[in-house]
UniProtKB/Swiss-Prot annotation:
The keyword Membrane applies. The gene is ndhE. This is NAD(P)H-quinone oxidoreductase subunit 4L, chloroplastic. It comes from Lotus japonicus. The keyword Translocase applies. It is an enzyme of class 7 (translocase). Belongs to the complex I subunit 4L family. It is a multi-pass membrane protein. GO terms for molecular function: oxidoreductase activity, acting on NAD(P)H, quinone or similar compound as acceptor; quinone binding. NDH is composed of at least 16 different subunits, 5 of which are encoded in the nucleus. Its EC number is 7.1.1.-. It holds the Pfam family Oxidored_q2. Disulfide bonds: none annotated. Keywords: Chloroplast, Membrane, NAD, NADP, Plastid, Plastoquinone, Quinone, Thylakoid, Translocase, Transmembrane, Transmembrane helix, Transport. The chain crosses the membrane at residues 2-22, 32-52, 61-81.
């Protein structure tokens, strides 16, 4: 696969994630869009690491760290959402202002 195809796909995924994150009112949908953004960044890291410096695996190793962070976010995010939905009876972002009591 050519470099341009992978970069266009990554930019497309990143754009979908940003659009969904900005327009989403649901916390679960926002978490899914954040995962799309992280996956697009991982695609860029691996692609540029493979294209520019094939001997050193800096992009691949950094991508593994990003995957670990995404896994932690995927584990903790739904727990936070379920806690908020239990307390506030809603998972809408605009109704979950926890600083105002």
């Amino acid at each position: 696969m050519m470099l341009e195809h992978v970069l266009v796909l990554s930019a497309y995924l990143f754009s979908i994630g940003i659009y969904g994150l900005i327009t989403s009112r649901n916390m679960v949908r926002a978490l899914m869009c954040l995962e799309l953004i992280l996956n697009a960044v991982n695609m860029n890291l691996v692609t540029f690491s493979d294209f520019f410096d094939n001997r050193q695996l800096k992009g691949n190793i950094f991508s593994i760290f990003v995957i670990a962070i995404a896994a932690a976010e995927a584990a903790i995010g739904p727990a936070i959402v379920s806690s908020i939905s239990r307390n506030r009876k809603s998972i809408r972002i605009n109704q979950s202002n926890l600083l105002n009591k």
